[in-house]
């Protein structure tokens, strides 16, 4: 049936499929960022339960480094903020792509409407 479709509609269908793949990739990224956010929050909660003079270690690449509770809290809060901004960015991209997806879908349906009759 695609051989019968005009090139413009074939192109729109290809764009639609590409946008759908991008939306799926963004959903995966969003899920990963949300998981990292959850981990950071759990770590902050645990740090909150520790005494102020507690010995804290953190991973830096392949190393485990001794650090202060305050420094760990600061780094985790910075990480949470960065992840939150990333999540907002992903959500905006998702909204734009979803809007474009719906728009293309309507254009294709309108173009195919008279052919279906």
Swiss-Prot record:
Any one cellular-component term (Gene Ontology): prefoldin complex
Phosphoprotein is among the record's keywords: no
Domain of life: Archaea
One of the record's GO molecular function terms: unfolded protein binding
Keyword DNA damage: no
Keywords noted in UniProt: Chaperone, Cytoplasm
Subunit structure: Heterohexamer of two alpha and four beta subunits.
Family to which the UniProt record says this protein belongs: Belongs to the prefoldin subunit beta family.
Protein function: Molecular chaperone capable of stabilizing a range of proteins. Seems to fulfill an ATP-independent, HSP70-like function in archaeal de novo protein folding.
Protein's name according to its UniProt entry: Prefoldin subunit beta
Species this chain originates from: Methanosarcina barkeri (strain Fusaro / DSM 804)
Encoding gene, per UniProt annotation: pfdB
